[in-house]
Amino acid sequence: MADATPGAEYWTALGWQPSTEQVDQLATLQTLLREWNEKVNLTRLVEGDDYWINQVFDSLWPLAHELKTPHQPRTCIDVGTGGGFPGLAIAIALPGSHMTLLDSVGRKTAAVEAMASRLGLADRVAVRTERIETTGHDRACRGQFDLAMARAVAAAPVVAEYLVPLLKPKGEALLFRGQWSEEDTTEFSSVISPLKAQLTGVQTCQLPAKRGIRHLLRVQPIGSCPSSYPRAVGIPSRTPLGS
């Protein structure tokens, strides 16, 4: 028996009405995640609301603007994709996008690559197995993305250093956060200035079923990111900007 998929209230709260095919893909992704989780420790958020709210909803709610133009061509990268979120959910929701999934753990990238293939996304989902500090200096990636995103990876200044070098001049970095305050905004806006970037917006969402408050930071370039960023492997996390 197939797992139940969310009802109309869920999609209304998300502000997105997926096609039947997209709902089927998201349901299939749950099944694939469950299968791969038996081989590789990808995530504990696989069943019921853990999957549909904490994985799918939490991946898509910040993209209300982008979901209005799903077929618009976009180059996207999900840094530290882990079990494939938010990247695979966004690739399903934005069929015009080309998504790169990045993780330094080969077992995880092998799993998400296999899942993308089973979902019929292989033609527009690429997978890279390497540290983001290396990716940020690769000509194939540096300055090449419309959207660069990271969810549950590291402190915000660290994530900004990972993402900003990947952006096109008019691209955006999407930093998925849990708790966030006005004090955080003030401090973060200051520490990212060496990246030649600015915080352009903070979005807030109360997840359904009282699953907690989430925030999204949108960061855009205001100039060319200096070639010294990201710093060498391990340094951004050991010595975050502003520390």
UniProtKB/Swiss-Prot annotation:
Gene Ontology CC terms, in alphabetical order: cytosol
Annotated keywords: Cytoplasm, Methyltransferase, rRNA processing, S-adenosyl-L-methionine, Transferase
Superkingdom of the organism of origin: Bacteria
Binding site for S-adenosyl-L-methionine: G80, F85, I132, E133, R151
Enzyme Commission identifier(s): 2.1.1.-
Keyword Transmembrane: no
Record-stated family: Belongs to the methyltransferase superfamily. RNA methyltransferase RsmG family.
Source organism phylogeny: Bacteria, Bacillati, Cyanobacteriota, Cyanophyceae, Synechococcales
HAMAP family: 16SrRNA_methyltr_G
GO molecular function (one): rRNA (guanine-N7-)-methyltransferase activity
Localization per Swiss-Prot or TrEMBL: Cytoplasm
Protein's recorded name: Ribosomal RNA small subunit methyltransferase G
